């Protein structure tokens, strides 16, 4: 049986732009993508901390070191410049689950620069439920 787990997240990034008339996606600074192990065109889930909106889309790579976190397409209606968002990626793992499992969390500052990279750890799968 496969289970879906958090693979990585970019925590509390600031939206730097929105472009409604674009064919969907989210542009993210390539350095942040690399740190969070996110590939171009990978599916992501976004949560807007300011308004509670949650949606899924795919990633487009933005210039490395730019701090860009731009919502594009119809989702531009779900976030405004300056909003705080959390970006999630997930992974499907066949049981038995490797223990410990270590999702990666990329913490950023107000300019979307990496301030810290953490690894959430649990000694057994049941502990994952309480550490996320």
UniProtKB/Swiss-Prot annotation:
It comes from Rippkaea orientalis (strain PCC 8801 / RF-1) (Cyanothece sp. (strain PCC 8801)). CDD domains: Asp_decarbox. One of its GO terms (cellular component) is cytosol. This is Aspartate 1-decarboxylase. NCBIfam families: panD. HAMAP family: PanD. GO terms for molecular function: aspartate 1-decarboxylase activity. It is an enzyme of class 4 (lyase). Its cofactor is pyruvate. One of its GO terms (biological process) is pantothenate biosynthetic process. Catalyzes the pyruvoyl-dependent decarboxylation of aspartate to produce beta-alanine. Belongs to the PanD family. It catalyses: L-aspartate + H(+) = beta-alanine + CO2.
